[in-house]
Amino acid sequence: MKLVLASSSPRRLELLGRLGVTPDRIISPDIDESPRKGELPRDYVLRMAQEKAAAVERADDEILVAGDTTVAVGRRILGQAGDAAEQRKFLELVSGRRHHVMSAVCVIAADGKARTKLSDSIVKFKRFEASEIEAYIATGEGQGKAGGYAIQGTAEAFVTWMSGSYSGIMGLPLYETRNLLISAGYPLG
């Protein structure tokens, strides 16, 4: 059974490796990732994972995995920080407060059946000093990341509390992914 990873994220590739899985092909789906007007974060991240999966061609003998992660402050979706100004804004929003990190994974089995699961985790950061935000931005590790930070990097030192899936916060919830792969017939130990 062959596996296709529909993602260019090095974190998703690393996380699949933790399951002992190496994709046979990696393809980055090209879709519009803009939220729809009034779309809730939960609906958005599920739709993104499903659209990414549907955007990649798959052979009959292939299982496909796609995922998406978003950070939500209330109903507000914080996508990938495009530049330092946006990252600063995101970090100011999550400073000292709880926020949700939602990670959806969609697996399409060899028979074409798609299954999707959602992991919803909560993270609380300390209240940031302006100098801490600037120092973090200078590391570059949060650039292009949902919410403007990477939990697996130096941002982890700012976490005062979290609940949920650490791998989901990183970008691919392993529990949900493992179960979806097994239900799709992918051989896991």
Name each model-derived stretch.
Residues R11, D32-S34, K113:
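Surface-exposed, flexible loop/turn segments at secondary-structure boundaries
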Residues R18-L19, S34, R97:
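Short acidic/polar alpha-helix capping motifs at helix-coil junctions
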Residues K2-V4, L40-G189:
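Anionic-ligand binding patches
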Residues M1-V21:
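N-terminal beta1-alpha1 ligand-phosphate binding loop
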Residues P23-S34:
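A short beta-strand-loop structural module common to alpha/beta enzyme folds
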Residues S8, P29, A110:
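Cofactor-binding loop segments of dinucleotide-utilizing enzymes, especially the Rossmann-like FAD-
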